[in-house]
């Protein structure tokens, strides 16, 4: 549940080059553009265990097992120009966004605790990559577990 986010999907195939105009000779259509590469997924937040008879968290204490953000997919390239009367090649599909890493797991096991207001415990999921329209999911929120021992 807390591993790295998956890689973004591969870019779509470039569009077919346009046909040459029959009245103007048989110019070749341009090549389709290359598909963009998928973004790398974010890393999971990992795990932290605090097991002690007494746990103290001060006002500036920070415990963080957040997932990292996924990388953005790379946009597809534009196809080449046609030769002669040929049309231009289509633009390649965009690569998928990398998924955000899932938040991790934090365990606080104690007999007594002293938590001062202002501390921070977070297990947020990472954001997906931000290439427009290229999919990718945000990471899931992790788990914070308190246990009396």
Whereabouts are the PLM-identified features?
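Glycine-centered low-complexity coil/loop motifs and glycine-rich tracts
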Residues: 1-49, 58-107, 116-149
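Alpha-helical support elements that line or immediately flank enzyme active sites
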Residues: 53-55, 113
């Amino acid at each position: 549940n807390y591993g790295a986010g998956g890689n973004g999907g591969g870019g779509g195939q470039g569009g077919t080059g346009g046909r040459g105009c029959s009245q103007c000779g048989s110019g070749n259509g341009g090549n389709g553009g290359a598909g963009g590469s998928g973004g790398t997924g974010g890393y999971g937040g990992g795990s932290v265990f605090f097991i002690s008879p007494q746990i103290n968290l001060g006002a500036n204490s920070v415990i963080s097992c957040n997932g990292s953000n996924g990388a953005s997919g790379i946009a597809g390239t534009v196809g080449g120009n046609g030769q002669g009367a040929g049309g231009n090649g289509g633009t390649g599909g965009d690569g998928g966004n990398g998924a955000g890493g899932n938040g991790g797991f934090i365990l606080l096991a104690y007999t007594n605790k002293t938590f001062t207001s202002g501390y921070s415990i977070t297990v947020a999921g990472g954001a997906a990559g931000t290439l427009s329209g290229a999919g990718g999911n945000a990471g899931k929120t992790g788990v914070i577990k308190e246990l009396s021992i």
